[in-house]
């Protein structure tokens, strides 16, 4: 068994972050949106009704700790697998132990750290054992599960998003570590400069583990004086080095930057869009994530006002893949500028959403006979394809008066092109075709 509940409180050699690891929900800092009083996950943990789940969040937000607390709460055996160092062999061994636990009427939590690093076949290896209840699967990932995990695995697990801890929460974690005489630094004679813990908490961007590691390093490096160990900002700067960008790929700051980029492009502000793109890159963001977002923008915010926008966005993505980051980042910048100055239309976005909603809400109307496929004589005898008008045989390849909706929806219109860009011509053409329909002698529906 690969149980990961170690009592570092009794081990002077354990790292501070491990010693201070919470063992109950009451000791746990952060994630009040998930485990605050009355929240569904907290109720499930307290009731012992645990199901498979994925914890998605930045480093140091308590994913592993929460899994440990859950395991302790339901008195389950824990099999821990790291996707960085494990493969199919380790997965099979863990499953075999879980099967033995099941024979002994013991639950097993299979905790998979960095689960996004497993490939499709490795992820698939968990499915039958989740399905038959051999294990309760808990995966931890710093990457977006929608992109990194198989749909089959996602459908069998509830995804919970863990947020970066706030500065105040990190400061509480640090204060507890300073004061706790058993697990923390309470026995040390520390002389802390005023507001030092707050400065450290602001630096680590919501990563509690990093905060505790930095605190421990400062204590180790501090000189012993007559009154104790003095820890000031000079020592803090020495430990921290150059301040890093306040950025977290999976946290709110990341999505705030992406949102700012998207809104700048939508608002036809190329300079602002370039600024936010540069901020994302400087902070370590993935340029290909931006490239994917540009494809969505090309469809959602430009649409048929400039159909070339999609081609430009796709070409930028392709360029990045072919030439690498240095040149590829500039190609993405070019696409950002193009999309920013392109005429804007959300007519496609609105039309598609309306069509999807009606398809969901309205009855499943039959396909009219003239639109049905008729590959066999029987189908032809049943009237399939009867009176279908082949557009290419009609004047200007348009069957005036024909209708391709069920009769119940004959006058429906989803797509309303704007008066911008290419949609000006599209709108004019559709208006001409509708006038032909109105004046047509041969109409499908009266």
From Swiss-Prot:
GO molecular function annotations of the record: ATP binding; ATP hydrolysis activity; DNA binding; enzyme activator activity; single-stranded DNA helicase activity
Residues that bind ATP: 57-64
UniProt-listed GO biological process terms: DNA synthesis involved in DNA repair; DNA-templated DNA replication
Superkingdom to which the source organism belongs: Bacteria
A Pfam family annotated for this UniProt entry: AAA_assoc_2
Keywords: ATP-binding, DNA replication, Nucleotide-binding
Record flagged with keyword Metal-binding: no
Function: DNA-dependent ATPase that plays important roles in cellular responses to stalled DNA replication processes.
Family statement drawn from the similarity comment of this UniProt entry: Belongs to the AAA ATPase family. RarA/MGS1/WRNIP1 subfamily.
Listed name of the protein: Replication-associated recombination protein A
Native source species: Haemophilus influenzae (strain ATCC 51907 / DSM 11121 / KW20 / Rd)
Gene designation per UniProt: rarA
């Amino acid at each position: 068994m690969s149980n990961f509940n170690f009592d570092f409180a009794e081990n002077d050699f354990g790292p501070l972050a491990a010693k201070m690891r919470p063992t109950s929900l009451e000791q746990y800092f952060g994630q009040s949106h998930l485990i605050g009083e009355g929240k569904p996950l907290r109720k499930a943990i307290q009731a012992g009704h645990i199901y498979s789940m994925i914890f998605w969040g930045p480093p140091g937000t308590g994913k592993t700790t929460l899994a440990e607390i859950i395991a302790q709460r339901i008195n389950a055996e824990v099999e821990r697998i790291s996707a960085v160092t494990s493969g199919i062999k380790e997965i099979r061994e863990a499953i075999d132990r879980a099967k033995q636990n099941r024979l002994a009427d013991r639950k097993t939590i299979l905790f998979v750290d960095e689960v996004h690093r497993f490939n499709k076949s490795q992820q698939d290896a968990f499915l039958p054992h989740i399905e038959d209840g051999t294990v309760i699967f808990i995966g931890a990932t710093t990457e977006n599960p929608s992109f990194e995990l198989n749909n089959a695995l996602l459908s069998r697990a509830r995804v919970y998003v863990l947020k970066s801890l706030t500065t105040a929460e990190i400061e509480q974690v640090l204060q507890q570590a300073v004061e706790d005489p058993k697990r923390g630094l309470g026995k040390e004679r520390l002389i802390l400069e005023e507001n030092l813990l707050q400065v450290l908490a602001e630096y680590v961007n919501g990563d509690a583990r990093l905060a505790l590691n930095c605190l421990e390093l400062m204590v180790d490096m501090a000189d012993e004086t007559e009154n104790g160990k003095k820890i000031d900002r000079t020592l803090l700067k020495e430990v921290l080095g150059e301040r890093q960008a306040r950025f977290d790929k999976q946290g709110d700051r990341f999505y705030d930057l992406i949102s700012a980029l998207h809104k700048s492009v939508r608002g036809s502000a190329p300079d602002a869009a370039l600024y936010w793109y540069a901020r994302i890159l400087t902070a370590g963001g993935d340029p290909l994530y931006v490239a994917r977002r540009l494809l969505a923008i090309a469809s959602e915010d430009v649409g048929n006002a400039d159909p070339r926008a999609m081609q430009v966005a796709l070409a930028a993505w392709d360029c990045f893949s072919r030439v690498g980051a240095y040149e590829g980042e500039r190609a993405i910048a070019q696409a950002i500028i193009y999309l920013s100055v392109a005429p804007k239309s959300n007519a496609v976005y609105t039309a598609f959403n309306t069509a999807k909603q009606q398809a969901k809400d309205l009855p499943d109307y039959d396909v009219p006979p003239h639109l049905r496929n008729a590959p066999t004589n029987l189908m032809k005898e049943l009237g399939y394809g009867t009176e279908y008008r082949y557009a290419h045989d009609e004047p200007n390849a348009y069957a005036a008066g024909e209708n391709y909706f069920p009769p119940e929806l004959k006058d429906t219109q989803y797509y309303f092109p704007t008066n911008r860009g290419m949609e000006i011509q599209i709108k004019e053409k559709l208006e001409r075709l509708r006038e032909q329909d109105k004046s047509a002698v041969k109409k499908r529906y009266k």
